[in-house]
């Protein structure tokens, strides 16, 4: 059978707290999400839903980020100025206290070939990094966001913490899944699962570092560059595979730019 899961958001509240000092302002934006987490199981032969195995559970999630604004002269505004976003921190969301992110590292990829192993992929230069201690105050300049070449291959390594008890699906003992998605508006695409099973670019089995490759998409038809949002989600497996396992999830969202190579 095949397991599918997703969130049905029923209520979304946003609050913004501002503090102004001279020509700069700081906004703390919080989102409170409430809804239903749905797990659906289908027979892979008939694709019929197996109602006796699927379930749903309520969830709530808090997401926050800080945004810096600067006062900018604008003669078309009656006040003579407007507030423009200059920088923002990553958006961080969590439900429960079981799983969290320790660090995120993004590398370029070095690929080589040999007659025995075929294509070998190795970690290249470090392109972006952050750790849990700095996320809340790591301001990303709007004019200097992490930038990747269109259709470039990159390597993701995400270190996680799982406070347990862990629910594992096999003898490897990994108790969480780590997903990567991207989007421009409310729509998120390209869900891709990283792994901690020592497969592919993951080097060590169950060391709490999930790794994977991601081929960056293009900026869009007729666009030379464009800004997107990445979403890195950590979800405890007991959330997906047990009805009584609660809802424990951690999400990190970072804006980034995709540009065509000249």
Task: Provide a role label for each language-model segment.
Residues 55-56, 145:
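Outer-membrane beta-barrel domain signature
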Residues 105, 236-262:
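Short beta-strand elements
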Residues 182-205:
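Solvent-exposed serine/threonine-rich low-complexity stretches and specific carbohydrate-binding patches
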Residues 60-63, 200-217:
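Aromatic sugar-binding surface patches on proteins
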Residues 1-48, 56-58, 66, 72-80, ...:
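Acidic/polar, low-complexity intrinsically disordered N-terminal segments immediately downstream
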């Amino acid at each position: 059978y095949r397991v599918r899961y997703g969130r049905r958001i029923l209520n979304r509240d946003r609050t913004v707290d501002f503090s102004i000092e001279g020509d700069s302002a700081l906004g703390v934006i919080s989102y409170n999400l409430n809804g239903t987490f749905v797990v659906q199981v289908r027979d892979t032969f008939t694709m019929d839903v197996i109602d006796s195995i699927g379930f749903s559970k309520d969830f709530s999630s808090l997401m926050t980020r800080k945004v810096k604004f600067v006062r900018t002269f604008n003669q078309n505004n009656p006040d003579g100025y407007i507030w423009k976003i200059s920088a923002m921190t990553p958006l961080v969301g969590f439900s429960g206290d079981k799983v969290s992110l320790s660090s995120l590292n993004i590398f370029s990829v070095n690929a080589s070939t040999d007659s025995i192993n075929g294509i070998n992929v190795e970690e290249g230069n470090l392109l972006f990094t952050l750790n849990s201690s700095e996320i809340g105050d790591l301001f990303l300049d709007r004019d200097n966001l992490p930038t990747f070449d269109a259709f470039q291959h990159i390597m993701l390594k995400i270190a996680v913490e799982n406070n347990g008890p862990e629910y594992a699906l096999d003898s490897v003992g990994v108790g969480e899944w780590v997903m990567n998605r991207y989007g421009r508006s409310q729509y998120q695409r390209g869900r891709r699962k990283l792994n901690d099973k020592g497969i592919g670019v993951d080097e060590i089995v169950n060391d709490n570092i999930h790794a994977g490759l991601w081929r960056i998409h293009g900026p869009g038809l007729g666009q030379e560059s464009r800004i997107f949002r990445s979403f890195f989600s950590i979800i405890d497996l007991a959330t997906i595979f047990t009805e009584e396992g609660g809802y424990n999830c951690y999400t990190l969202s970072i804006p980034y730019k995709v540009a065509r190579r000249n």
